[in-house]
Amino acid sequence: MKKVSVIVPVYNAAEFLAETLDTILNQTLEDIEVIAVNDGSADNSWEILEDYAARDTRMHIIDQKNGGPSAARNNGLNHAEGEYVFFFDSDDLLVEDALEIMYEKAKRMDADLVIGKYDIFNGVSLTSVKNLDELVSQDVIDKYDKGIL
């Protein structure tokens, strides 16, 4: 069993997709599987996914009709075999030890859910979200989930 299944819904993401996949596949935690679900892209996203799958056995690719990101995530989840699941968007980037840090923290704390610091870049400015209080105040997670890490 892989430690982490990384699920990436992909829709017309060719511009950023290679960089996104590189940040996942170059993680210090190597015991992962990447499940990329092409959600009916009209650009060359599928060809990029095929290229990565041919080069790295940790890549699993699925092609589906467009159903939106939730349908793509659910499809990926149906194929996931990892101990933990990490949802990742096709235009996101990770620091190289992000999955290892979150996995080790989850194991050590016997956590069901781990939320890490992240930055949001809207093309103009960068906003850092650093702690649970900020997430709760933004209604990103249910305010009753106080026991999460």
Report the location of each language-model feature.
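Nucleotide-sugar donor-binding/catalytic module of glycosyltransferases
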Residues: 1-149
